[in-house]
Amino acid sequence: MSILWSYEPELLGTAGGVKRLADRFDDTFVVVSGDALTDVNIKELVEYHREKGALATIALRRVYDTSEFGVVEVDEEGNIQGFQEKPRPEEAISTLANTGIYVFEPQALDYIPEGVFFDFAEDVFPKLLERGERFVGYQEDFYWSDIGTLAAYRQAQYDVLSGKVGVKIPGEKRGEGLWVGEDAQIHSSAEIEGHVLIGKDAVVGRGVKLLGDVTVGSDCWIRPNVTIKRSILLPGASVGGGAYLEDCIVGHHYDVRPQETIRGGALIRRA
């Protein structure tokens, strides 16, 4: 896969950043926000966009709490009628969230000025409605999670391990809900329950308990008699003997001290 990076000395917004690469787009193209986890079928999304003869298409996902999302109103034909930004549920015009996944024709870039901060939701989409452009919403059953909070990040990890997301989990599947990476070492006395991923070259010591949904990244070292519940260890993290972790995220190469008890939050570095 070839990847082209576009560095912005000054941020240009969701639309301004795409406009900066306008000379790269000579056909239908897809924009996907990078802070979400999804298994949306891009092929089907683009086919829908073309069948509708649209200039722009937004992938929509129904949500329960609209106060966290921009919502989109559509008619029976899928045509977008209006937008509302993070309304209270009782005031929402719709429960269909803008996922930040878009399909455009190159002509849509004409609505974006060059070199200035410009946003799709706030600036471009209202113009498309005002001009009466063919602008539609795609509604299908796909997984989507806006990973904008620690709680959402943890939940997305759990959803992957429980099979709710159509993604490939690295490692060898051993029994129901357990994936083990290459050269990982797991002591025979370790207790593992729920959905657990143990990464490449990780070490799980004697008497360790991994309970609930737990992700152990590559090169992690969990020393004896540690208990970890519903937590994520990023690559290179280590946990001292007898420690207890629950509902937390342990950062890259972070060392949890022996006998330490931690509940909730994210551990990045010590003060």
Which residues does each predicted region cover?
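Structural signal for interior beta-strand "rungs" in well-ordered beta-sheet cores
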Residues: K173-A271
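Catalytic-core segments of class I nucleotidyltransferases/pyrophosphorylases
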Residues: F29-V30, L37, K43-R50, Y64-T66, ...
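A generic structural signal for alpha->beta connector loops
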Residues: S2, G53, E77, G132-R134, ...
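Nucleotide phosphate-binding site architecture
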Residues: K19, T38, L109-D110, L211, ...
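Conserved hydrophobic/aromatic beta-strand scaffold that supports enzyme active sites
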Residues: I58, V71, I101-V103, I249
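A generic local structural motif
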Residues: G16-R20, I42-E47, R88-P89, E122-D123, ...
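FAD-dependent flavoprotein oxygenase/oxidase catalytic domain
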Residues: S6, R61-R62, E73, E77, ...
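Conserved beta-loop-beta/alpha segment of the NTase-like Rossmann-fold superfamily
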Residues: M1-E76
